Amino acid sequence: MEDGRWKMSMKFEDLESWQKARALVNGVYTLTRTGSLARDYGLSNQIQRAAVSIMSNVAEGFERVHIGEKLQAYNVARGSTAEVRSLLYVIEDNFPGSASSAGQLRTEAVAVGKLVTGLIQSTESRKSKLGSLLSTLFSLLSPV
């Protein structure tokens, strides 16, 4: 569904990137509610917010009408995937009991990042095609 084909009836919940981001959020919440990590409120809160940001910005970008706004939201989502991955290294390094789960979630975050990059590339392609179409149209309408 995220290969550039767009349907009027499609919802952000239909996007694979949003679905995978939602699963990542659930994994992050599960991880941060266990063991000594549950007592590190600052780190837990930060990674939770970053994970939610991915999911929310994919949804927001999909619902935006203007291509520039779509790209901005998708780029924020992509940046948040990097933040989640980085924070998972902090967890892995400082909470040995959570290292395995952190590594698994980092793999999921990489996959989500690739899907978000696909959304960005698809949107940029549509922007480029629209620009070319408008340029051609204006050249045809311009008086000689």
Feature map (PLM): residue ranges:
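Short, C-terminally biased terminal segments at protein or domain edges
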Residues: 1-144
